[in-house]
Amino acid sequence: DLTYYTPEYQTKDTDILAAFRMTPQPGVPAEEAGAAVAAESSTGTWTTVWTDGLTTLDRYKGRCYDIEPVPGEENQYIAYVAYPLDLFEEGSVTNMFTSIVGNVFGFKALRALRLEDLRIPPAYPKTFIGPPHGIQVERDKLNKYGRPLLGCTIKPKLGLSAKNYGRAVYECLRGGLDFTKDDENVNSQPFMRWRDRFLFVAEALFKALAETGEIKGHYLNATAGTSEEMMKRARFARELGAPIVMHDYLTGGFTANTSLAFYCRDNGLLLHIHRAMHAVIDRQRNHGMHFRVLAKALRMSGGDHIHAGTVVGKLEGEREVTLGFVDLLRDDYIEKDRSRGIYFTQDWVSMPGVIPVASGGIHVWHMPALTEIFGDDAVLQFCGGTLGHPWGNAPGAVANRVALEACVQARNEGRDL
């Protein structure tokens, strides 16, 4: 049905725009594939139905308005689709994804399909709360300025008792870290129930705070099997006076995540977001969804921190692409820049920013590169890079803090990192 391919269409400021990387089956023309994507992800179905006459499809249909071949790839195209804003429920990332990526990825005429980027018009984010607090409010709450923040995931991630877990938290925070973190798989298992962990961690937080004079946090993982249980854990964290809780937003789901974000804003809790399961969705180059789309969705659904890869030691091109979605998380206005993987100019207007978290395989020798790449508004998480120190956890934390302060001072003095 080629009525969904409309190259003459002028996109509206209120449209949601999507860039899909399409690989059609052999023999299927690109225009036909692009039209099929637009139809299946909006008002179309596999046949003409008489009830189409009861609505104005021209007002509600998605339109494929541009198709460009991908240079260097055989039979691969970027298809641009515009969706009228009325197709989406206000304040629901869940509904946005159900529409745009819900069904179309299993389409027979396509060999593969990947959602590369979305342009969210300012009218739509205005219906979301977004991050519970955002970067500036977080700095004010923590009273920490002019440098990246330091974190560490407590390992071994599974198997410690609550008491020993709390001890590891205390040692890291006492040594100089700002945050420690529950691993994403730490929920409430037989060897360590969530309530016991929360209690011992709270004790560690306040002891470290009293001895260092710095505000300390531990990402208490509230992720649970039901959203009611998740809220119960968040409430208990607040009752203990903890400054921050954590959620696995992809495994926990956007609906639960947005509920938790509302609770965190109402109750002064920061919200740390882990992206467990993201590689299932974003790892394949030609099928699935790019992480920058998941990052934009999280900024709308709500979170103050999100894991965003490390950049260090990878290819240069990957560095640019990672910095592209790091900017999408932090900045108000991001210009279209294809070299950084940004297909559309994105204007967030006044929505608070999210702090990117660099985590996984980094250690103290990466500090100069990390401070240069990420700047101040980031959390640098050294897991094995703290707990793997030959002298113990606290000296590992000291090493990271000293390295960070040295790099920040060198940068401020204008030296070459």
Curated annotation (Swiss-Prot):
Residues the entry annotates as binding substrate: N103, T153, K157, R275, H307, S359
Residues bound to Mg(2+): K181, D183, E184
Modified sites of kind N6-carboxylysine: K181
EC number(s) recorded for this UniProt protein: 4.1.1.39
Keyword Lipid metabolism found: no
Gene3D superfamilies, per the entry: Ribulose bisphosphate carboxylase, large subunit, C-terminal domain (3.20.20.110), RuBisCO large subunit, N-terminal domain (3.30.70.150)
Cellular location(s): Plastid, Chloroplast
Annotated protein name in UniProt: Ribulose bisphosphate carboxylase large chain
Homology family: Belongs to the RuBisCO large chain family. Type I subfamily.
Gene Ontology MF term list: magnesium ion binding; monooxygenase activity; ribulose-bisphosphate carboxylase activity
Gene giving rise to this polypeptide: rbcL
Additional information: The basic functional RuBisCO is composed of a large chain homodimer in a 'head-to-tail' conformation. In form I RuBisCO this homodimer is arranged in a barrel-like tetramer with the small subunits forming a tetrameric 'cap' on each end of the 'barrel'.
InterPro entries (alphabetical): RuBisCO, RuBisCo_large_chain_AS, RuBisCO_lsu_C, RuBisCO_lsu_C_sf, RuBisCO_lsu_fd_N, RuBisCO_lsu_N_sf, RuBisCO_lsuI
Chemical reaction(s) catalysed: 2 (2R)-3-phosphoglycerate + 2 H(+) = D-ribulose 1,5-bisphosphate + CO2 + H2O; D-ribulose 1,5-bisphosphate + O2 = 2-phosphoglycolate + (2R)-3-phosphoglycerate + 2 H(+)
Keywords, ordered alphabetically: Calvin cycle, Carbon dioxide fixation, Chloroplast, Lyase, Magnesium, Metal-binding, Monooxygenase, Oxidoreductase, Photorespiration, Photosynthesis, Plastid
GO CC annotation, single: chloroplast
Site annotation Transition state stabilizer: residues: K314
The protein's enzyme class: lyase
Protein's UniProt keywords contain DNA repair: no
Record text on subunit structure and interactions: Heterohexadecamer of 8 large chains and 8 small chains.
Cofactor(s) in the UniProt record: Mg(2+)
Biological process annotations from GO: photorespiration; reductive pentose-phosphate cycle
Reported function: RuBisCO catalyzes two reactions: the carboxylation of D-ribulose 1,5-bisphosphate, the primary event in carbon dioxide fixation, as well as the oxidative fragmentation of the pentose substrate in the photorespiration process. Both reactions occur simultaneously and in competition at the same active site.
Catalytic residue list: K155, H274
Cofactor: binding comment: Binds 1 Mg(2+) ion per subunit.
Major localization listed first in the record, in broad terms: plastid
Transmembrane feature ranges: none
Organism of provenance: Acrostichum aureum (Golden leather fern)
